[in-house]
Amino acid sequence: MSSSMSTLRNQFLIAMPHLKDPNFEGTISYICDHNDEGAMGIVINRPLDIRLSDMLAQLELGGEGIAMPVYSGGPVQIERGFVLHSPLGDWQSSIEIAPDICITTSKDILEAMARGVGPDRTLVALGYAGWGAGQLEKEISNNFWITCPADSAIIFRTPDSEKVVSALGRVGIDYHRLSSISGHA
């Protein structure tokens, strides 16, 4: 992370319209960590064709009837599960990213969700988005991404199709007016 750029932890990373990478085209990611070694985030608007009840059944945890979608969190370690949630709770492997947003990777949170006693707000993802040292900063300087402050309501309550527009609207940007052509002044 360059000294000219502060951490992007607890920020949204929104793909510019000209970013045609199939892993990120049209996405909004929540940045969970960002430091000198790189960045890690979860794509929050790409539901998979799988429901949480299906995943819980595959893990033999029960949870029948939970219609919540499971998301494609990114192209790295797509077999690994991540749960963004609020409030923090007492799970084996949780990190508080912001006062109202945590990430957990341990199975105990899924067990609690299957029993109906999990966190109030959740987003379950398989895989994550990762960037090496300096990679994300370079992509931002090349106009592939827009960053803006994260909002838990967008993660947990906003329909997937509205997340990008809602996040940009919070900082006064009209997504529909963004150009699909990039450049530098």
Swiss-Prot record:
Cross-referenced SUPFAM superfamilies: VC0467-like (SSF143456)
A GO CC term assigned to this protein in UniProt: cytosol
Species this chain originates from: Hahella chejuensis (strain KCTC 2396)
InterPro entries cross-referenced by the UniProt entry: AlgH-like (IPR003774)
Protein name: UPF0301 protein HCH_00550
Protein family according to the UniProt entry: Belongs to the UPF0301 (AlgH) family.
Disulfide partners: none
Signal peptide: none
